[in-house]
Amino acid sequence: MKIILAKQAGFCFGVKRATQIAFEAAGKGGKTFTLGPIIHSPQVVQKLEEMGVKALENVAGMDEGTIIIRSHGAASDELEEAVRKQLDILDATCPFVKKAQEHVKNLSNSGYDVVVVGDADHPEVQGIVSYATGKVYVVASGEEAVKLPKMGKIGVVAQTTQSFENLRHVVDACLVKGGEIRVFHTICDATAVRQEEAKKLASQVDCMVVIGGYNSANTKRLAEVSAEIQPRTHHIEMAQQLDPAWFEGVKIVGITAGASTPKWIIDEVLEQIESIAKDKNR
């Protein structure tokens, strides 16, 4: 059984930067916390906890110490509260997320109604929305955007893990909703590249394994685009979840991983699949 690993599997720039900031802070000791999980990887969060860095839902209970802003960013009021309390702030917000926050703030201040394309329950989107000073709407698809009310000036940004195709559908729906529309490119390039690579790989293999946190938006999207092409797509968080039955009759297996998946987990999955392949060949 041949195994093909996607070239872009694993940490993206923003996640690599965030984890580096967090682990460096953990190594220095002291009262250090992250505002929410630093990234959507339970294994990384657990490692940080073992080093004394725990994730907090908010800064309400903090009076001193260091707070690390997660890669998904934070709501503006949480940041203001951290500043008011004079906490040491380490901002690990992904630069692409930061750009989306700034666009929303500027659009709102310029009189635009803002449309954010993404998952309303995702912390990144909740943070982005908090920078709006006027009307702001969150839509997950073009179908939802069709239901938006008429507006004057519209500004559109997207959650960084969205697909360009979904963004286009929303923009098309918004074109008839207002007299002026401004669209900003806030989708992470790494996200787009990984999704295209996953599609290509899925078309070349008999089975796909997508590695990453079940709460990771970009990993779930990788699994979705892969499954559209290769129905035998399996989303796992760790090697122990692999089922040898998945590989019955499989000659080529493709592997990709979300932007928040650590290399050591990818290596463990590779090793386990190689072991399954050896057992099949006996």
UniProtKB/Swiss-Prot annotation:
Keywords from the UniProt entry: 4Fe-4S, Iron, Iron-sulfur, Isoprene biosynthesis, Metal-binding, Oxidoreductase
Cited InterPro entries: LytB/IspH (IPR003451)
Cofactor binding note of this UniProt entry: Binds 1 [4Fe-4S] cluster per subunit.
Residues the record lists as binding isopentenyl diphosphate: H40, H72, H122, S216, N218, S260
Catalytic residue list: E124 (proton donor)
Record: residues binding dimethylallyl diphosphate: H40, H72, H122, S216, N218, S260
Reactions the enzyme catalyzes: isopentenyl diphosphate + 2 oxidized [2Fe-2S]-[ferredoxin] + H2O = (2E)-4-hydroxy-3-methylbut-2-enyl diphosphate + 2 reduced [2Fe-2S]-[ferredoxin] + 2 H(+); dimethylallyl diphosphate + 2 oxidized [2Fe-2S]-[ferredoxin] + H2O = (2E)-4-hydroxy-3-methylbut-2-enyl diphosphate + 2 reduced [2Fe-2S]-[ferredoxin] + 2 H(+)
Molecular functions per Gene Ontology: 4 iron, 4 sulfur cluster binding; 4-hydroxy-3-methylbut-2-enyl diphosphate reductase activity; metal ion binding
Known role: Catalyzes the conversion of 1-hydroxy-2-methyl-2-(E)-butenyl 4-diphosphate (HMBPP) into a mixture of isopentenyl diphosphate (IPP) and dimethylallyl diphosphate (DMAPP). Acts in the terminal step of the DOXP/MEP pathway for isoprenoid precursor biosynthesis.
Protein name: 4-hydroxy-3-methylbut-2-enyl diphosphate reductase
